[in-house]
A protein has these predicted regions:
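Substrate-binding/active-site clefts of carbohydrate-active enzymes
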Residues: 1-66, 77
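Conserved alpha/beta catalytic core and glycan-binding cleft of carbohydrate-active enzymes
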Residues: 41-43, 55-173
Length: 173
């Protein structure tokens, strides 16, 4: 009863998407996040796969339906956690290059302070591992370094390796 029983249930990890519209689910997730911040003293939280919380297929523009309850949950939790734990950092691993993820909720966004910038890692990784200068794009490196969500250099987290980048037999840089 705490998971969707329709098309919204499907994720790449099975039919396991929680029903973000249920008050019990929302409260459980909020209480869990607060526990990490309050009892364990975490300085922030990184939310995994937020695109799968807010969309059925996990990709903006792929034709899959949005999940309004998921978008509402992200906004609600960021509002609540920011109010209760000022100065903590909330980061989305959204991977869709969607600037609304880091817009404040009062401006229609999800309210995260930063999000992972997947485009950065791919441009830098290609430049570093390319065996030939002919295939290396310094313009792509420049664009990756200069990119900003909402005009802010602090709205993104850049990285050259992550658990996703080196998993499943992929090589490290």
């Amino acid at each position: 009863i705490y998971f969707y029983n329709d098309w919204r249930a499907a994720t790449p990890w099975g039919h396991t998407r929680p029903d973000y519209g249920r008050p019990e689910v929302r409260q459980f997730l909020l209480d869990n996040a607060a526990m990490w911040l309050e009892e364990l003293g975490a300085d922030g939280l990184r939310w995994d796969a937020t695109s799968y919380i807010r969309t059925a297929g996990g990709f903006d523009g792929d034709g899959s339906a949005g999940i309004a309850d998921g978008w509402s949950l992200l906004r609600h939790m960021n509002d609540e956690l920011n109010a209760r734990f000022p100065g903590r950092i909330f980061i989305a691993e959204d991977m869709q290059h969607n600037a609304s993820i880091t817009l404040p909720t009062e401006h229609g966004g999800a309210g995260f302070q930063a999000q992972w910038d997947a485009a950065f890692v791919h441009a830098i990784r290609h430049a570093v591992i390319s065996p030939s200068d002919e295939t290396r794009s310094m313009a792509a490196v420049n664009n990756a370094l200069a990119f900003r969500y909402n005009g802010s250099a602090f709205d993104r987290v850049v990285f050259t390796e992550s658990h996703d980048e080196v998993a499943n037999g992929k090589a490290r840089v």
